[in-house]
Design a protein with these regions (language model features):
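Short, hydrophobic/amphipathic alpha-helical patches that form generic packing surfaces
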Residues: 11-22, 87-94, 154-158
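Residue-level detector of conserved catalytic or cofactor/ligand-binding positions
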Residues: 162-171
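Short His-Asn-centered micro-motif
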Residues: 5-7, 140-145, 168
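Generic beta-sheet signal
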Residues: 1-3, 138, 165
Length: 171
């Protein structure tokens, strides 16, 4: 079964919720703008904040570390990251958090590697981003490999407290 979602983290959590509710094994999870119709069965998943919160609470209850890993893993440039993260959650709920100590686990390793790459890029950009002033507003443009802006926001908000600064990703 292929699930199609809106591309948000809550939408991804709703995919996990629906796969458990419908007892379906997923072969792919695609953002709606990336989906190409195929002969395989597919279903569009609606984002429901209550369902997403239930899934996140369950993950946090099992392993707060995995919840953090999921949130950061979702920001990575890992191909098919949704499927890797889905399998990570399935394994967590099935086996418990014990497998998280085995860093060479085939479910865990690709996610850990991608998150390590994300964190390295965030660290690099904290020292690399330069702002230019234009009309009283500080602005910067970056071209990251991962979706780093949510992780950079708190650093630069604390550093530039003038309130009028902008950083955007080049498309």
């Amino acid at each position: 079964m292929i699930y199609i979602y809106d591309g948000s983290f809550n939408g991804f959590l709703c995919c996990i919720f629906d796969s458990y509710a419908n007892k379906e094994v997923l072969t792919a999870i695609c953002r709606d703008e990336d989906f190409v119709p195929t002969l395989f069965a597919s279903r569009a998943i609606q984002t429901d904040r209550d369902h997403a919160n239930r899934v996140l609470r369950k993950i946090v209850k099992c392993s707060p570390y995995t919840a953090e890993l999921l949130q950061k893993g979702f920001l990575t440039c890992l191909p098919d990251k949704e499927l890797y993260l889905y399998h990570l959650v399935v394994k967590l709920l099935k086996e418990g958090p014990g497998f998280l100590r085995n860093f060479s686990d085939e479910t865990l390793y690709p996610v850990l590697k991608a998150v390590r790459h994300l964190q390295g890029e965030v660290h690099l950009l904290k020292g690399f981003i330069r702002f230019s002033e234009l009309g009283g507003v500080l602005g910067s443009e970056i071209e990251p490999k991962n979706r780093v802006l949510p992780l950079l926001r708190s650093h630069f908000c604390a550093r530039y407290q003038i309130g009028r600064a902008s950083c955007r990703e080049r498309v």
